[in-house]
């Protein structure tokens, strides 16, 4: 079934003319309204934008589009032009896109979705296109902006108006390409409606966000929407993933070109693969020929992400040789298999792995490439107010793959950290785990126990610069704490 989420047939941009004033900017957050804006009062997941119409008008909104539902009526004291729009939340991105001149139409937009790998692939593609002379920006978990000049963000995929504003800003600043992480929440909540995607990339589907979606089936259906997007030219899909194979088989090749990739199968696959602490060496078969790729990126699962990038570059007109050459220059995204130490001290690896699949892949990778005789430590926890079903699963994975499992807090949010730890311990032999709820102390303990040749994986938070405890985000960086722990390690008698 073709999802026509970018150009709803019953939305007519000419309707905005009924407001009787020039429209240069729209805003869906009353706190960000500027004088002269048109305020989009949408019903949201946790709040109703119609409740903030008075606040938007006080800030100078010139007109209001409001969600026509639930018997809501415009109040006479709100003396401003207004227009009732059914399902405004679904149309907000489309309205913003038309007001801003359809910015994605002038860009090559690559959307990346899947449980794991979105951030790495989006960053690597932005780097690669930029190094190839095509100015590239990105929108995602670690930040928004041009590579090397990112601003922090609170959501993987921003709200629909912000998405369009960012695309318009990047177009104005000369971008040719935008790589965008597209979360299941973003698709389910219509945040990318109005975006014209050239290429969609699917990484994998493993357990995550079941607290929101309720089932893996619903989670998969959300991801699937991106690959039946109106006007999509290319779909790059992981054929090692069962859902990916099903997805690829359901796409009409007359509408969208499908290129699969994978470590075991796919149109783009390795004929040879060597993984070490120094990086990856691959000989890759592709529809465009065979090529050797050398990179400093670490880990077999990163080899799969690299193949996704190689395929995406090639379907967008980059020659195979140029694509392979530029991948050799790629640097890892912050908090994604990011290492510190090594050589004459333990190696500490910071990674965002916060799902069972991601944790298992990170541990398996490091177990494979660690020095002979070296031990593998795993410092990890599970987030509060999120799917509790994955907690014992992650405990079992840490016990299976790590020589020393160090159980600590992640972002407990409103939950009791000790209760989360008990949930994790239910999946493992508690006697084999070192428990330290204080994350900083846990990292210091693991590094202090480690020797030269040992590897310490600090998993779960990656790039994050905070820890959310009891609803308060306190400054915290796994990377900074790891550096401090290594400094202390070096000062030992």
From Swiss-Prot:
It catalyses: UDP-N-acetyl-alpha-D-muramoyl-L-alanyl-D-glutamate + meso-2,6-diaminopimelate + ATP = UDP-N-acetyl-alpha-D-muramoyl-L-alanyl-gamma-D-glutamyl-meso-2,6-diaminopimelate + ADP + phosphate + H(+). Pathway: Cell wall biogenesis; peptidoglycan biosynthesis. Its cofactor is Mg(2+). The modification N6-carboxylysine is found at residue 223. It is found in: Cytoplasm. ATP binds at residues 114-120. Keywords: ATP-binding, Cell cycle, Cell division, Cell shape, Cell wall biogenesis/degradation, Cytoplasm, Ligase, Magnesium, Nucleotide-binding, Peptidoglycan synthesis. One of its GO terms (molecular function) is magnesium ion binding. UDP-N-acetyl-alpha-D-muramoyl-L-alanyl-D-glutamate binds at residues 30, 156-157, 183, 189, 191. A motif (Meso-diaminopimelate recognition motif) lies at residues 410-413. Carboxylation is probably crucial for Mg(2+) binding and, consequently, for the gamma-phosphate positioning of ATP. Meso-2,6-diaminopimelate binds at residues 386, 410-413, 460, 464. Pfam families: Mur_ligase, Mur_ligase_C, Mur_ligase_M. One of its GO terms (cellular component) is cytoplasm. Its EC number is 6.3.2.13. One of its GO terms (biological process) is regulation of cell shape. InterPro entries: Mur-like_cat_sf, Mur_ligase_C, Mur_ligase_C_dom_sf, Mur_ligase_cen, Mur_ligase_N, MurE/MurF_N, UDP-N-AcMur-Glu-dNH2Pim_ligase. NCBIfam families: murE, PRK00139.1-2, PRK00139.1-4. PANTHER family: MUR LIGASE FAMILY MEMBER, UDP-N-ACETYLMURAMOYL-L-ALANYL-D-GLUTAMATE--2,6-DIAMINOPIMELATE LIGASE MURE HOMOLOG, CHLOROPLASTIC. Belongs to the MurCDEF family. MurE subfamily. Catalyzes the addition of meso-diaminopimelic acid to the nucleotide precursor UDP-N-acetylmuramoyl-L-alanyl-D-glutamate (UMAG) in the biosynthesis of bacterial cell-wall peptidoglycan. This is UDP-N-acetylmuramoyl-L-alanyl-D-glutamate--2,6-diaminopimelate ligase.
